[in-house]
Amino acid sequence: MNESIFLSAFNAKTMTFDEVASSFCPSKKYEELAGGWNALLIGPRGSGKTTLMKMLSLQGMRAWPADKLITRPEITYTGIFVPADIAWSEMVSALTRDAFDSRLGDLVAETAFVTNVLLSAIRTIELRVSRAASAPEFQSVTLTGSTHDEWIVHAAELWGLKPQSLSLRALTRALEARLINFRQEVRFIALQHAEFDEAQLRERIPYLGLSLIESVSQSLISFNQAVGETDHKWALLLDEFEVAPLSLQSTVLRALRGGAPELLLKVALAPCGPHTTLAEDPITGPSERNDFRQVLLWYPDRGDAEKFCEDVCRTWLAKKDPDYAALPLKEVFGTTPIAIVEDDDSEDNKVEDEPTRQKRLHETSKLFISLAEKDPSFKEFLVRRGIDPFNLAASDDVYARATIRKIAPIVAFRNAYRSNGTVGKKRGRKPYVAAYVGWGSIAAMSEGNPRWLIGMLISIWTGRYKDSGLPIPRAAQTDAARETGGAFVEMLRSLATRPTQGAEVGEPVLNIVEKLAKYFHDRLVTESFVEDPPMVFVVDSAISSAVEESLRLALNHGAIICYQGPDKSGGYDSLRGRKFRLAFLLAQQFKLPIRKSKEISLSTALNSGVLAQPGLSEMSVPSANNSATKVNATTGDKPVQDTFPW
């Protein structure tokens, strides 16, 4: 799977409203966003922001399939979807270079943005009115006669238009013509360098300086009056708003407080976009819960995303292979051979029947024995904890069950990558693929990101044998994880030359990711065994601003996952002091387990050299047939008779 396929898989930006609706899976995030309030939708690239925005629009509501299991929500406002237009940023860049007045550049950018918003608004109004006379649809209204003509005249005056006739279509065409003319004027002005002042600019662009909120809200209020819905609300659905110039972002974010009550604002943003550099007034500025709600499209704990992943998968299967859609997904994809155990044991992990328990202990015993034979530090750990790998049932029954379950995935990884007879030496480069198969692993690696999940599903279905039966062969699953993760890595590699707006990236994002992954892998495999090797990092004060800027870019693209919410409206002002982990989609690429663990400072991880396991500690580890080993009682480790037959 190449980068372009990876990025285009299920990209709602290029899909019609009907196409988006046919595969849409509502989630709790959608419910949070859909309410009758202002909202900031924050998420990395590919996390589904455009899908959610489109499915709140009038077009999305009307495209909602009648046979969908989840009924259409009762949304009382009319959503106006405003797609991103990179031209806003390009216009400002073209004008502000060569010493063009930056204030005038902002004015030009806002005019471009307002024109796009008005165009989206009038197209939505056309939809509400156009079919009302024939077959009434969701939120259809009637606008006829003198009331119709009066509103056209009023809107044209508000927007500075001269439509060729008194019709909604004429207003639309006038705005389309304005947008074309406006871009031509901007190109002309840019070629003149800094020769234009404000008066000359207004002479060429008489509609310059239209107020965003007032231009939109006043026209919508008058439309409500014209159709007899004086209390009706509208919502601007501003997609990918981080690409808009900073002045526009400031205008919209300020409007979250004190804006027109008839006009809701729902804004999609990257977590570390330019808007996070804006100063916030704690007294007069908007505040979360009071003025808006913040919806975060990422899942630090994998369990939070499982239900959504299941819904997305079943919807996709219903189209691709309907016979599979009703089956348990663990039957379709199988289970992960080595359980993925988080810091806290779930109820599912605690309850198992006796045959399942015996099978688990048998497989775990083989792993423990194999690693202990080639890893003295692990043998020492077992002795300290009183765990006999030849009789795990005894330890599992009494006091070590949680420990055994917790370390089993670590032991499996360590055993897979360590060579026999050489302290701290790793063996071949082939990944331990058993950890990346089964529905649990697939859902975890997707991170609740629909584009990633569907990308893996497409790859799995492409690579499997048609008559292979169930569960789907592991080879098809591991190949899909490798291909999808590899395409993601290539996308991260390209970020070295594609920094975020206004940012100077001191070090390529992928370099930092690779350093972190190597550190975590070495701690897991080559250092002395510990039951909780670090897999989480904290951005500490020793980290340079250049590295932090690279991390911000990584967060915007989903390469790292933050455990804490944003520290300001719409994103993160600073990453320092916050905990992160690498995205699980990168796990197979860098030979890491799909789990969280204890944390380490980022500076420690980045400044670490090649880690080698030290020799055994001074504590004596007797060979088989020796007498009991005494352990320091203050550690809580249980003394045990060392009779393990190594």
Model segments located where?
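N-terminal pre-Walker A segment at the start of P-loop NTPase domains
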Residues: 1-30
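Hydrophobic anchor at the beta1->P-loop junction of P-loop NTPases
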Residues: 41
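The conserved Walker
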Residues: 45
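Conserved lysine of the Walker
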Residues: 49
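P-loop NTPase nucleotide-binding core
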Residues: 54-222, 285-393, 451
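A short beta-strand-to-loop transition that corresponds to the Sensor-1 phosphate-sensing loop
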Residues: 56, 268-273, 450
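Conserved Walker B catalytic segment
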Residues: 199-269, 280-282, 571
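C-terminal leucine-rich, beta-strand-based interaction scaffolds used for sensing/assembly
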Residues: 353, 357-646
